[in-house]
């Protein structure tokens, strides 16, 4: 699918640490679904068309008491984001995410950091299928390192033209990370090494072949047994071009069909 549109948002500070975000967006999503696409995609197009339009209001709140946004050693960061498709449009939906980060100084140089994030999406009004192009994806940088990006969640393996299962994403997700950071010897404060433990998964609708031999789909209910875990080590560098992170990860409970990726890097701050 391909999404085009425009958005406008602005932030309003109302305390030293708190900020509110307000905005809106209009989007048109062109869905190219055919007989080899996941059955849920085909049913969605049959019901809502191949080019649904949505107008959504966005709202958010953040609180940031970290001592440094690039390389924090203490403090808390929270962010709540909401997106609601307005009534009367092709799709009426809502989705929310909440992120919580906490940095604990263990000594002058060692820091323990926690990051947790949850996401939830659903529909209302005349819409009864959550738009799959609004799904959450888990896996890879920013969630569970050691697995390929966006691969931890419901899959559809009914496409006989494709040996690999399609990663569908989900309308619910959880991920959490714990990092222990320390500076490299030599006093260079722009370089830090870290060890980490990640966990996460997304839940939604998975594809399967029913008793009649036809492609179908069903909800994948929340279960902690679906969670994937990984651990590893890495280097964080505040470079002249911006913050960089390099990690070497080892999946702890890889299951059949999972796609792994040991070495990963990211540009930007945060987990």
Which residue stretches match the model-derived regions?
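Short, solvent-exposed loop/turn segments at the edges of secondary structure
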Residues: 1-3, 52-54, 260
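Short, glycine/acidic-rich beta->alpha junctions
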Residues: 2, 92-96, 226-227
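Mature, solvent-exposed C-terminal subdomains and processed small-chain segments of exported/organellar
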Residues: 3, 13-20
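Phosphate/diphosphate-binding loops
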Residues: 4-8
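Flexible, glycine-rich linker and terminal segments associated
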Residues: 20, 269-271
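C-terminal outer-membrane beta-barrel translocator/porin domains of Gram-negative envelope proteins
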Residues: 25-191, 195-220, 257, 265, ...
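C-terminal structured "cap/appendage" subdomains that terminate the fold
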Residues: 200-203, 209-259, 263
């Amino acid at each position: 699918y391909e999404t085009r549109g425009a958005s406008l948002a602005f932030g309003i500070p109302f305390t030293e640490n708190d900020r509110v975000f307000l905005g809106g967006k209009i989007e048109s999503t062109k869905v190219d679904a055919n007989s080899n696409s996941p059955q849920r995609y085909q049913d969605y197009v049959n019901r809502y068309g191949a080019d649904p339009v949505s107008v959504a209001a966005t709202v958010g709140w953040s609180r940031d008491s970290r001592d440094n946004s690039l390389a924090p050693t203490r403090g808390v960061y929270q962010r709540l984001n909401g997106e609601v498709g307005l009534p009367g449009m092709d799709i009426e939906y809502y989705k929310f995410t909440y992120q919580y980060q906490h940095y604990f100084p263990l000594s002058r140089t060692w820091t323990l950091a926690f990051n947790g994030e949850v996401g939830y999406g659903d529909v209302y009004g005349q819409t009864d299928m959550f738009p799959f192009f609004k799904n959450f994806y888990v896996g890879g940088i920013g969630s569970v390192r050691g697995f390929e990006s966006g691969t931890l969640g419901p899959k559809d393996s009914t496409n006989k033209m494709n040996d690999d299962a399609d990663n569908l994403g989900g309308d619910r997700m959880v991920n959490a990370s714990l990092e222990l950071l320390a500076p490299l010897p030599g006093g260079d404060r722009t370089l830090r090494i870290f060890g980490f433990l990640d966990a996460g998964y997304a839940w939604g609708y998975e594809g399967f072949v029913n008793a009649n031999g036809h492609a179908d789909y069903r909800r994948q209910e929340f279960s902690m047994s679906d969670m994937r875990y990984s651990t590893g080590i890495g280097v964080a560098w505040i470079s002249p071009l911006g913050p960089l992170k390099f990690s070497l990860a080892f999946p702890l409970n890889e299951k059949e069909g999972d796609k792994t990726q040991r070495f990963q890097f990211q540009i930007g701050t945060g987990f």
